[in-house]
Amino acid sequence: MKKSARRQSRELATQGLYQWLLSNASSGEIDAQLRGALGYDKADKALLDAILHGVIREHATLVDALTPSLDRPIDQLSPVERAVLLIATFELTHHIETPYRVVINEAVELAKTFGGSDGYKYVNGVLDKLAAKLRPAETQARRNG
């Protein structure tokens, strides 16, 4: 199945944030490398820029929002899980136009693509709790049918 431009953007953002978490390179350096990455030409560049630079800029705030939904310190998560959860937290807080179920599904798919064998289950559970806190009206409406 062909990937959407938005999915491609999220995949590239995951790769960039993974690199940032491990190397602490500047967002400009990571951005420059991503521009040469396979699939960049098919990505939604505005979304990629918003996610990559937004997560790096607001890292501390996103970690604060995410931490209460975790069952362990964030630094004990794999870099892939951290990157995916930070992207989803950013989208839940800044891209209200994207339904929370889409944000969670995209994060689960990213975790399946890049993470360990069961990492996607953890990502799903964390984001389900987080979405209920960050978007209570939307999640409640969904649960009430």
From Swiss-Prot:
Domain of life: Bacteria
Keyword set includes Ribonucleoprotein: no
Name of one Pfam family that matches: NusB
Keywords for this protein: RNA-binding, Transcription, Transcription antitermination, Transcription regulation
Biological process (GO), any one: DNA-templated transcription termination
One GO molecular-function entry: RNA binding
Keyword Transcription: yes
Gene Ontology CC annotations of this record: cytosol
Function of the protein: Involved in transcription antitermination. Required for transcription of ribosomal RNA (rRNA) genes. Binds specifically to the boxA antiterminator sequence of the ribosomal RNA (rrn) operons.
Family: Belongs to the NusB family.
NCBIfam families in the cross-refs: nusB (TIGR01951)
Protein name: Transcription antitermination protein NusB
Species of origin: Burkholderia multivorans (strain ATCC 17616 / 249)
Lineage of source species: Bacteria, Pseudomonadati, Pseudomonadota, Betaproteobacteria, Burkholderiales
Gene designation per UniProt: nusB
